[in-house]
Amino acid sequence: MPRIELAPEVFDDFDRFFDHQEKYGIEDTSGRIAEINEAIQVLAHSPLIGRKAKAGKRELVIGKESRGYVALYRYVPDIDAVFVLAIRSQRESGYK
């Protein structure tokens, strides 16, 4: 079973989500982060489940509509590890 590691930038992404949700009065921000973390755990069992992205990376689609996110990650089978590189809202363009 692959180990999952979050890049330091992912925590910046979470901070950005908190700021955005606070700005618009959205409740249950911590619940949304928990949903994202729970979805990422799927990669421990199925690291190739995400759609292919550029440069050997993959994207895991999490949730939908206003609760939709995309996690950019790379699976390295040689060391059996998944590196989550960034997370963005499905409504954002590109990664920060």
Label for each model-derived stretch:
Residues 1-58, 64, 78:
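Basic, Lys/Arg-enriched alpha-helical interface segments
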Residues 21, 64-96:
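Enriched for short, Lys/Arg-rich terminal
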